[in-house]
Amino acid sequence: MVSFTTLLTAVATAVSAVTASPLEALKRGIQPGTGVHDGYFYSFWTDGRGYVDFNNGPRGSYRVSWSNVNNWVGGKGWNPGPPRRIAYNGTWNNWNVNSYLALYGWTTNPLVEYYIVEAYGSYNPSSGAARLGTIEDDGGVYDIYRTRRINQPSIIGTASFDQYWSVRRQKRVGGTIDTGKHFDEWRRQGNLQLGAWNYMIMATEGYQSSGSAEIEVRSLD
């Protein structure tokens, strides 16, 4: 039997939810960090400027909104993240702001940050980089790039490291990615070496922008 005290508590909770301020609502998302939720690894990082409300959903899904950020990135996937075929879908309507939707991950020894970019907004992440080759995957063409980061945040702290990129010419929000194909072509066409597998997530990233996304990822292997 439900007690009167329990009913009062439920009513108070409901009223509190309705009357919560926007700032309080922002606090309901998870804190920056990494972990496992419903069988999937997640990572959420922010440099602390602006607001990011990141929420894990069932299985490989998450939803996020951000406002006036400097830089943040987060998503769900696997750790470790060896080569695999993945499928993803969702909503990402950040075409007019600086944001990426990408399969994102890291390796160590060597320390490498990599992106397989499916969609981007107002800024092309390959701007200013030399193209090393192309990859065909799931009916689209990706251009391969390498950039270098000096004394920047990484999974081992502040460090210098290479970034490897596959940037899809035909932007999209939904499809499949054969990560092994990208990794092989990075080595073959650009002599881009990867190390020990760290995490791999289907990520949303925002830079000096506001936006939102709802994404789900799953493995096909």
Curated annotation (Swiss-Prot):
Regulation of catalytic or functional activity: Retains an activity of 52.5% in the presence of 5 mM SDS.
The entry's keywords: Carbohydrate metabolism, Glycoprotein, Glycosidase, Hydrolase, Polysaccharide degradation, Secreted, Signal, Xylan degradation
Glycosylation sites: N89
Keyword match Transmembrane helix: no
Species: Humicola insolens
Enzyme Commission identifier(s): 3.2.1.8
Activity versus pH, per record: Optimum pH is 7.0.
Record-annotated GH11 domain positions: 28-218
Positions annotated as active site in the UniProt record: E113 (nucleophile), E205 (proton donor)
GO molecular function terms noted in the UniProt entry: endo-1,4-beta-xylanase activity
Protein's name according to its UniProt entry: Endo-1,4-beta-xylanase 11A
Activity relative to temperature: Optimum temperature is 60 degrees Celsius.
